[in-house]
Amino acid sequence: MQKFKSVEELINQLKPDKPVYCIRKNSILSASNYFQKKFPGKVLFAVKTNPNAEVIKTLIKSGIEQFDVASVEEIKSVRKFSQSAKCSFMHTVKSKESISEAYFKYGIKTFALDTKDELIKIMESTAKAKDLELFVRVAVSNEHAEIDLSKKFGAISSEAIGLFRLVKQHSNK
């Protein structure tokens, strides 16, 4: 990876005619440290927002220990730099194979779901594991949003209560 002291130096040397992907590690470290100091909870980075290996490595170096992953490939990306990082498989539609691989090969115990079918799939793919941490995504009203995604993500209110009851029977937390 080429390194430049500034964007101006990059432009002068490369004279790019296409977009250039730049990583400012010091900015990532600074933002991560600031957020971790100010946020009272646990910080979980969504790998899909920037799956670049240098970004993940820099975040781990800054002390981020938890990652929201949406695929086995994202789990591998995190584990390449930290075997102890906690990965939470938060994609709500996963294949049985990816659930099984995540659980049995990588030790992933945290999964998100928003349907009974997804819960059944998780239970079958983990051999009805007793050490799971399951999250139910609930759809909330987005009536004032520019783009209403409330019908795309999460269990609707009328189904969520029953789903919570089912999850409670199978979840560690």
Protein language model features and the residues they cover:
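A charged N-terminal "starter" segment
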Residues: M1-F111, K116-L132, Q169
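Conserved anion-binding
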Residues: K105, D114-K173
